[in-house]
Every structure is written in C-alpha cells, then in structure tokens.
Amino acid sequence: GFHRLAIMDDTFQSNQPFILEDEERTIIFICNGEIYNFKDLIQYYDLNKEIKNDCLVIPTIYMQLCQRKQEQNFIDVIKNAVEGEFAFVLFEFNHSKVLQKIIACRDEIGIRPLYYQPSITYGSLILTSEIKGATTYPGVLTEFPPGHMMIYDMSDEKIVLDSVDYSTVYDTRPPLCLFDERLQTLSGEYQPTDDEYLNDIRISVTNSVNRRLVADKPIAFLLSGGVDSSLVAALASRTLGTSICTFCCGMEEGTDLKYARDVAQKIGSYHTEVIFTPEQGLAVIPDVVKTIESWDTTTVRASVGQYIVSRYISKHTDCKVVLVGEGPDEVCSSYLINWYAPNANALGESAKEYVKKIHYFDVKRADRCISRWGLEGRVPLLDPEFIRSYWSLPYEERMPAYRGIEKWWLRQPFADMDLLPEHVLMRKKEAFSDGVSGKKSWFQIIQDFVADKVTDEEMAHAANTYPYCTPATKEAYYYRKLFCEYFGEDRQEIIPHYWQPKWDANGKEVAGYVDPSARTLSIYSDTTK
C-alpha cells in the first residue's frame, strides 16, 4: 500500500506506484521522498520535459539506462546526481511479466524510513516504511541501512542479493577536503582560512534550506528559538521574501516560547504558540510510542512536543510541509556533553557515530511525529552538502572550548547578516524535551507520572522481563511496556540501544544508563553562569 501526500504535483498522473513499460520490460516504482534537483536531472538526462513529479525521474532514468544496456550505472546516478531524501523500491519485470529484479534504496542519512528483512525467509521479502506494515511477519525485521542500495536479482532460480554502500558523506576528512581547485595548484599544502571556512558553511547552509522551499503546498516552520530552527526560518523568510508561518510548542513558562517569539518578531513571521499542559502531554505518550515505534527514553520525551505541534498544524492550517532544525547537534558536536570530550579526535569521530545512528533517534522522531498527521517533514541541516562543509573543519576547531561556545562555526557565518537577535544566535544548547518546559523539567513531570504506573516488583524483575537493553528506570520501563504491547517483544531490537551521553565529567565513556537530559549535567548549570 502507499499513501501519497501530493506535495509535488497533485495531479492524478503522479499517483503511485509509477508504471513504466517498453517492449522488453515493465518497471513498477514506489518512493517516499523528495528529489530536490529533479528539474536539473530532467535536463541533464534529456528526459521528457512533461515530467512534473520529482520522484518519477528516478525510474525514468533507470529505464533509460536499461535501454542503453547501462543499468549498472544506476548506483552512480543515485550516488553522484540525485539530491534529496528518499526510500524507494523498484520492481523490474521482463516482457513476459516475470519478476526479474527488485532494487531497494535509502538516502545516506536515513531521513525517510525503511525496514526490511535481512535474509529472505518464509518465501517472502519484506520492505516497509513502518513496523506496523509487518506486524504479521514472524521473522527478523531491521532498519534498512542508510546510504545503501540492495539489488535482488531473481533472473535465475536462486535469488542473488548485491548490497552496495554508496554513501560518501562519512569520507569527509579535515582540513583539506574542500577547495579542490586550490589544492590542485598547491599540491595539498593549502590550509583554508577562517573566512573561507565561514563562507563555505554559510553557502552550504543557505543552499540546504533553499532546496527545501520547493513545494506545491504551503510550508510551516517549527521554531524552538534555538539557533538551528531559527536559522532555517530566518533564511527561508529572506529567500522567499514573504512572511512565513512559524510554530512553537511548549508548556507555560517554557524557555523556548520567549526565544521563538523574539525570532518571529525579528523575521516578521505569522507566529503561533501551541501551549499544552503537563496532563495533555502525558495523555499522548501512548500514541507517541505507537507513532514513533521506539522505546528510547529521550526520543519519547522529545516526541511529545513535536507530536502536539504537528497535530495542531494539521488540524488548524493548510500547511503540508514542515521544516525543522534537527541535525546540527550531531553534525556540529553541540550537545553539552561534548564539553566533556577527552580530546579533539574523540569528538570528531563521535560526530560521525552520532550521525550514522541519527535515523534511530532524532530523525525517526521528526519524521514520525510529523507524518503521523499527514504532513511532510524536511530536515535542511542534515543535507550532505552542509555536513561535508562542516566536517571539513579540523577536529580541534570543532571543540566547544575552541571559541567558548558549541557550534561556533554554525553561528558565526551569520553574525553580520542581521538575520537573528544576538541573544538567539548565541543561545546555548537546550534539548527540545527540556526547552518545552519551565521551572519543572518535562522529564521530571514524566517520572512523577510513571511512579505508580510501574511497580517496584516489576523493576526488580526488569532484567528477566526485558533482557535486551534492560530498562533502568520506571520511565524507561513504561515506554518499553507500551512498545511491546503495540509491536511485540520480538521487535525490541529495532532500536540498537538507548541514546546516551557519550562522556562523563571526567572525559570517560559512559558505562551503564544515565539520564539523557542535559539538565542533569553539571555543564548545564556551568554554561548558564
């Protein structure tokens, strides 16, 4: 099955699945995605100029390659030419309508969800965008790896699987991976200046935002008042040259509300504050767990606000696209725990580790909470262009202490552009699940709530009940119990581990479970002094 939001080209001709035929083959194609440079691809590959749907260019290019006996080049098209986020499945049948090949592929960050069975068993092949799509399937189900294309060749009696890792963003190496023309003339000896780094980051961020402003439906912007979402909204407003619609979600006295209000006033947006009470937040947790298909503590906490604001946008506006600010905390190593990093190399490598796993956590949260309400989420600051640009910085210059604030290199490129109020541009990191709350933190409200939802006896036997990533708190136990009620105990391993702070205050890797809220860290109070 396929549910289409019709963000690009809402005509009947763009309904999926797409079916393309010639004398030798039939191609059936399904894609959950947005291909932002589809018009450039139409021109470059000399495709039919009547194509209006962005996703349709992919099977059309594949058909063209097949007709030229060059289908082996399809992976290079995805790797080097396509700009966007996607999860797609392509079926190729021969002229006798016998299935010959299945190709499945996911963007290299994993913005769009895709699950699959790692081995072909029970005489079936499962590919689904949600766990809910395979509730009756008894075998192992896992995340389809981002940045991979898997080709199932069925032309012979035995199915042959060819898995290709096409991702390139993790190959980025500082400091000499940009400015290729200069490198060619100076034999790799050139060290970019600060101004060149700042300019490159400014360009990459702007490009990443602008790519995601193309839509046939109105766009909403989630605005927490943090530097990430504020930059996205401010740059979009400047590019579009019109007042945009911004939304902030929180409880009364939530710290995000004031900062978001200041940004909205600065950029002149139509701003809406979606206020919820602790009781309203607690009431949606069961459906949040079902929606995001996760038992991870911090993911559930942060999902509540995003779930509530997305519900509001869906019910009270005509917006269908939602731009969010997720990504820089992982890319730019800006979680407050990174002040504890033992050295620059450890910090730089941990950024790659966080981004490689972001599809299990923040990306899953954003995609599911938004799409739950018939909306499409877009994540500009996880664009590979921006990631490569930022990761070209030397590791030591990404350390929070380098300039006395986390992600200085993301803030500084826009310091002289009069985009944002100074206090917003330099606002310290505040987790989404913390920023929605006021004097009493959201995680404390939840912990009080679950105190009588999980018994002491249940906690005493937690290791026996849930031996995989055993819940260490009543809050974690409550989420796990909900997850297993919806999806069964066999699906727990969909999530590889709890999201955890990387280091403790002594620069040692964290062992065992610690609360993921930044407000529990000593560095939180230190950076507010």
Labelled PLM ranges:
Residues L47-E50, D156-S163, E493-I494:
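Short secondary-structure junctions
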Residues Y44-E50, R68-K69, A134-L141, P192, ...:
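Short, polar/flexible loop-turn hinges at active-site or ligand-entry regions and domain interfaces
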Residues S163-Y166, L420-A431:
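Conserved S-adenosyl-L-methionine
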Residues E21, C31-S96, L222, D228-A233, ...:
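Short histidine
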Residues Y62-R68, S129-A134, V289-E293:
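Active-site loops of AMP-binding adenylate-forming
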Residues G1-F29, E34, Q72-P192, T206-N210, ...:
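N-terminal glutamine amidotransferase
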Residues F93-S96, K101-I103, I111-L114, P118-I120, ...:
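ATP-dependent adenylate-handling active sites, centered on carboxylate activation for C-N bond formation
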